[in-house]
């Protein structure tokens, strides 16, 4: 890689690191190509980026971004996982991926500007994702309206049942 290519990579990484809400550093030791491809596919489906980065280029790209606070962790084989929307989804996907693989470990992360260790990522993985939270909020907002409709409809339903019972009673008498 010549100097111009390196500068392009650094510039591109710098922009992505600056935009990322979550940047997770992982150590992908002992993974075969098929396993890494499967992980990349799952992450891509969730709109999460997975890159194997050259440490010196990544450390230079991190300058002036929140990732700079963990730049000293760019040592040895390093995978950089970045999410630009949701901070929980990449943590969940990586935690799930790590269950079956002893060699794949999370070193550290920067989540919305805060440094988080591997245990913090595991805790974050147990939280509901952004879509789940939106669903829960929508359900909480809709619940009072549903209950109000049920309460307002109850007298009418009761009246209909009373009238129906009275009709049956009159039909039996005739």
Swiss-Prot record:
Pfam family of the protein (one): Ribosomal_L10
Gene Ontology process terms (BP): translation
Keywords annotated in UniProt: Ribonucleoprotein, Ribosomal protein, RNA-binding, rRNA-binding
This protein's GO CC annotations: ribonucleoprotein complex; ribosome
InterPro entries: Ribosomal_uL10 (IPR001790), Ribosomal_uL10-like_sf (IPR043141), Ribosomal_uL10_bac (IPR022973), Ribosomal_uL10_bac_type (IPR047865)
Superkingdom per UniProt: Bacteria
CDD domains (alphabetical): Ribosomal_L10
Purpose: Forms part of the ribosomal stalk, playing a central role in the interaction of the ribosome with GTP-bound translation factors.
Family: Belongs to the universal ribosomal protein uL10 family.
Subunit structure: Part of the ribosomal stalk of the 50S ribosomal subunit. The N-terminus interacts with L11 and the large rRNA to form the base of the stalk. The C-terminus forms an elongated spine to which L12 dimers bind in a sequential fashion forming a multimeric L10(L12)X complex.
Name of the molecule in the record: Large ribosomal subunit protein uL10
UniProt organism field: Anaeromyxobacter sp. (strain Fw109-5)
């Amino acid at each position: 890689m010549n100097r111009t290519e390196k500068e392009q990579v650094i510039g591109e990484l710098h922009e992505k690191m600056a935009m990322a809400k979550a940047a997770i550093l992982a150590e992908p030791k002992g993974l075969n190509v098929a396993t890494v491809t499967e992980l990349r596919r799952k992450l891509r489906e969730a709109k999460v980026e997975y890159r194997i980065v050259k440490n010196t280029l990544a450390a230079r790209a991190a300058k002036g971004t929140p990732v700079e606070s963990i730049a000293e962790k760019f040592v040895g084989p390093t995978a950089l996982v970045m999410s630009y929307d949701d901070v929980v989804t990449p943590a969940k996907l990586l935690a799930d991926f790590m269950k079956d693989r002893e060699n794949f470990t999370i070193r550290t992360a920067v989540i919305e500007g805060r440094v988080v260790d591997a245990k913090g990522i595991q805790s974050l993985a147990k939280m509901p994702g952004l879509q789940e939270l939106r669903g829960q909020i929508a359900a909480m907002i809709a619940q009072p309206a549903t209950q109000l409709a049920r309460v307002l409809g109850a007298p009418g339903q009761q009246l209909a049942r009373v009238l129906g019972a009275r009709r049956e009673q009159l039909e039996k008498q005739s």
